Amino acid sequence: MDSNVTFKYGANDIAAQLRREINSGILQRFERLPPERSLSLKFNVSRGTIRAAINKLETEGLVTIKAGSGTYILKKYQVKIAA
């Protein structure tokens, strides 16, 4: 196996990491997410991959996207446990 191979994040991986940052308090409720460009550099992926991750979080109700303003955190991610 080539030791120079680096892990490439996918949209699901990035969404999961952002969820962890929200739950741990690194990212706070009503705080604006970093710009897509910053996130794409952080995760070494395209802005399209970042958009897909953010859209996933929006579908889950964790963030809201405000055109021209940014993406804002609405709430913490809650795992539902079956009784």
What are the language-model segments listed below?
Residues 1-83:
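Short linear motifs at protein or domain termini
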